[in-house]
A protein has these predicted regions:
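N-terminal organellar transit peptides
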Residues: 1-188
């Protein structure tokens, strides 16, 4: 019960700030998990309903995490954008794996000077019978295709160029490299 009262107070404060022309901001400094994504989507959906079209800044410092949960958060950010919100995404610290994909979700993508981006092939852990694992491989291939689509659409690189860079390794980029390749629009 106390959690609901606290959440209600936070919602009221967010509404008060939004009416004053403030940008709504959310810091996602966590692993991408069902719980962390659920909390973030709850906030974003609340903002979308209460103040359609309001400006939003999302700051990411994430080592990545669960692929499908990351895509759910990416889609929630796209709903905000389609609803007229101007969404700025910022990378600070480390935006790795799915964290790098989430950074791509904004209208404007900013990276802090000392931040790091890490991009790699989609990875997952599965166990089971051979036929089940083969089904999972098909799913991983689809998820990897989606990640490549997002990264190539938001950068100056083609799918093939990205695949060649990340094949069988983690690909680390400093902020100036990320800017040069179009993974961000600005470095601060």
């Amino acid at each position: 019960m106390a959690e609901l009262a606290l959440a209600s107070e936070r919602d009221k404060e967010r509404d008060r700030l939004a009416k004053g022309g403030f940008v709504r901001s959310l810091n996602f400094f966590d692993i991408v998990t069902p719980h962390s994504v659920d909390e973030a989507i709850h906030v974003l959906d609340h903002w979308r309903r209460r103040d359609p079209g309001g400006s939003v800044e999302l700051t990411f410092n994430s080592p990545g995490g669960v692929v499908i949960e990351g895509f759910a958060l990416y889609d929630a950010i796209q709903r905000l954008r389609r609803g007229g919100s101007n969404v700025t995404t910022r990378g600070t610290g480390a935006c790795m794996s799915m964290g790098a994909i989430l950074l791509q979700a904004g209208d404007e993508r900013i990276m802090d000077k000392n931040a790091m981006l890490m991009i790699h092939e989609v990875s997952a852990q599965f166990e089971g019978k051979t036929s089940t694992l083969m089904d999972y491989m098909g799913l991983l291939t689809k998820w990897q295709g989606r990640a490549l689509d997002i990264l190539s659409e938001r950068s100056t690189m083609s799918r093939d160029e990205i695949q060649n860079k990340w094949q069988r390794k983690d690909w680390f980029l400093e902020s100036d490299e990320a800017l040069e390749l179009g993974f961000v629009d600005r470095v601060e």
